[in-house]
Amino acid sequence: FGKNTTGGILNVIRTPVSLTEMGADLSLTAGEYGRQDVNAVVQIPIIQDTLGLKLFAAKVEHDGHVRNTTRNEDVGGDDKTNYGFTALWAPTDNFDLKVHYEVMEDTSVQGAYTNRNRVGELACTLTLIGFDPANGCEKDANDGKDKVESDSKNFSDNEYESTIITANYDTDAFLYTYIYSQRDMDEQNMQDFDGAPVHLLRMNFFNDWEQ
């Protein structure tokens, strides 16, 4: 924060769990290129003033506004699903325990890469020495702001699972807080880096993380 700062913080405050009132919140969004967003939150007080449950889910879909002329399909779209729950237990005025669990599934297209292969680079050299197709070079490319021509689909298959447990104990003089978290990440991403209809440089990489 302030002058010459190279970093900062983003504080995301979620909707709190209600211990007193049942309720629901639903929002729908639709737009061009197959845009469809659905967000839902449901509040369920299980024991009045003591135990409550919040359920949530969201879905984002978008076909993408860039046309791949080689594959004859729209690319650059989104396909994300998020769901989970938060439970809050407050047996006394000075103690509460919250358990949060959620899953994020992301099968979005990993971008729409344009052909930037200059003369002297391998994808362009293949074209110059007679290999097909004839537009491996940027100078021969037909792509633009809403059109690409890579031969591969930049797909993803990612799943993120998170658990957070928070306990607060207030002694009037001090507030003691314990936070436990666990996150599992399973990722697969395919990216066609050459951006041309030349079957040359693509990466299909996998990550499996736990923290």
Give each language-model segment a name.
Residues 2-69, 73-83, 94-95, 161, ...:
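Outer-membrane beta-barrel translocator/receptor signature
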Residues 72, 78-211:
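Outer-membrane beta-barrel domain signature, strongest for Gram-negative TonB-dependent receptors
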